[in-house]
Amino acid sequence: MYKNIIFDFGGVVVNFNPRDFLMDHFMNHRAEEETYDIVFGSQEWQDLDRGIITREEANKIMLEKAAHANRVFEVQTCLDEWFTMLETNKTTVQIMRKLKAAGYRLYYLTNIPTDVMDELRQREWFSLFDGGIASCDVHLCKPEPEIFTTLMQTCHLAYDESIFVDDNKANAQAAYNLGITGILYKNPKSFTRALGACGIEVE
């Protein structure tokens, strides 16, 4: 019997689609790909998630790379405006409220930089969570098994009583490999169906 639902943030609770963001801003495939590699696909972005580099340090390195690639305008625009992507997925939050009202405990497990985590903590839906782990706080990232076990131990969760929801297949698979039921999030409708398959009705 499931008691705990564990949520990723980006792509699940808040919108996060860097490639769409870049396409909307530049509409130039080469510029989009090069900017993606310098920013979202970079080692610095991974280090931000892991909490081992500051935003200022990461931005400095990214802009140095941008100068070599002649992409300073694109990268600076991206660094200035990417936060606007992080709009709350209101339908997912509605599902979360229904789950909470039905007695399920909600947790988060997210790869996220410190400054983004600080901002999301201020959103009204954050109080729905009973606990969770942010990668920047423990210097671990999904899909590493250690971040899952850290969450389960810290929050005293039973593996067979927990469902993990993520928009990244590798992360959902990592949870499954540890004995946690994994749901690959695509949209609220498919998420609701997947919950139903687990015996959880939220309609």
Question: Predicted regions span which residues?
Answer:
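Acidic, Mg2+-coordinating phosphoryl-transfer loop and its flanking beta/alpha structural elements
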Residues: 159-196
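Short, acidic loop-to-helix structural element flanking the phosphoryl-transfer center
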Residues: 73-107, 145
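Structural recognition of alpha->loop->beta junctions
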Residues: 122-136, 200
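Conserved Lys-Pro-Asp/Glu-containing loop-to-beta segment of HAD-superfamily phosphomonoesterases
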Residues: 4, 141-169
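Active-site neighborhood of HAD-like aspartate-dependent phosphohydrolases
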Residues: 1-41, 193
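A metal-dependent, Asp-based hydrolase signature
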Residues: 46-78
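Surface-exposed amphipathic alpha-helices with a cationic face
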Residues: 93-101, 152, 172, 176
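Generic structural signal for small/hydrophobic residues in well-ordered secondary structure
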Residues: 8-11, 51, 99, 108, ...
